[in-house]
Amino acid sequence: MHFLNFFNHLAIKNPMRFKLLLVFFMICHTCFAQQKTVPVIFDSDMGPDYDDVGAITLLHAFADSGKAKILATIASTKFEGVAGVFSVLNTYFNRPDVPIGVPRGKAVTQRDWQHWTDTLLANYPHQVMRNEDVPDATELYRKILAAQPDKSVTIITVGFFTNLASLLQSRPDKYSKLNGRQLVQKKVKRVVSMAGKFPSGKEFNIEKDAAAAQLVFKTWPTPIICSGFEIGEKIKTGLPLIHNAAIQNSPVKDVFRISIPMDKQDSAGRMSWDETAVLVGIAGYGPYYTLKPGKVVVADDGSNTWVSGKGNHAYIVPRMEIQKVQELLNDLMMHQPSRKE
């Protein structure tokens, strides 16, 4: 029987078996597709919380294994020093020349209350000293995207939607004759975001710039996969890292060493929201998660609701045991620099 005829026959005669087979093929396709090197723009608030540091560590670990190519690391906040923090971490992982961007316009300025950013800037080498030393975030997005193959770039955003909204609203420039939405449609394969609480709720990354999140979820032209608050809340990481005596002079270890003891709720490790977005963005969602397709709707107050069915959005649902995902993330967060420039 012809392959397509077989599927049509199966869909009519045995709908349940057809659905299971379809899910199997989707998972296989996702896993196969993710075997290639994934070109990534990493967009992070890098400051109010410290799971961003775990996330960028995963990013560099995947890059060292050939699974990711880091095109840029971009801040969605603009507290003074955020560019330097990115520079510290990129330099530590032997990628000091990865482009860094910071928003020039209106943006959140909230930073870490534990002051681990000050420790990194005072104790580790970095080339970037001031936010003014790096390009505007939107300009850098346009420059990087314009130079990439069509439908190739994965944007992993683990902060606010400030930059993505600005990118959508950007006008043609010296890098591309396309406006922002056209450029995204042409160059971006998908967005994977740590954002929202599902099926409904209020979550920090959306709430802090709700207007930007509304614009992105209403008008972004390519698929968006969300790792919601409920996913990372259950995954605790960082203790194996800070107890590993073999890891010395590590900014990543210092961040978790400083921060975990300062909050009783972190006694078993820090909740790991941002790391899950990097895992899905580069390794794929299977076998760790399944996808719930539909549409994210953001209210004016930053709360989100979910409309199941057709839509360009999806949120992840646990598939693998949480403990196994936790062990994987803890292992990746102990990754040491292995690539020399």
Regions found by a protein language model. Name each.
Residues 34-341:
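N-terminal acidic, glycine/proline-rich low-complexity segments
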Residues 1-37, 341:
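Bacterial Sec-dependent N-terminal signal peptides
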